[in-house]
């Protein structure tokens, strides 16, 4: 299992590589949805808390959909 910070940064990077116009914003929105944590929680606990395999899978699935231009809403 990886830390939440590592997972968030990888998601943001995948969106950047896909040419997303706002990768940081989109990644944090999806992160907040999957992990039920806000940005402050990520900053405070992102390097110590780990994701479950299910959470990680769901997050990256949503990242890939967003990379293919699926709207956030």
What residue ranges belong to the model's regions?
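Non-catalytic nucleic-acid substrate-recognition regions in nucleic-acid-modifying enzymes
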Residues: 1-23
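A sequence-composition feature that detects small, non-aromatic residues
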Residues: 18, 24-27, 51, 67
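A general structural-boundary detector
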Residues: 14-18, 29, 46
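Short, surface-exposed acidic
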Residues: 20-26, 39-44
């Amino acid at each position: 299992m990886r830390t939440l910070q590592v997972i968030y940064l990888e998601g943001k990077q995948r969106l950047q590589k896909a040419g997303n116009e706002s990768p940081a914003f989109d990644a944090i929105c999806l992160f907040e949805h999957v992990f039920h944590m806000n940005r402050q929680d990520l900053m405070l606990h992102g390097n110590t808390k780990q994701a479950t395999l299910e959470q990680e899978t769901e997050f990256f699935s949503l990242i890939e959909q967003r990379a293919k231009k699926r709207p956030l809403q």
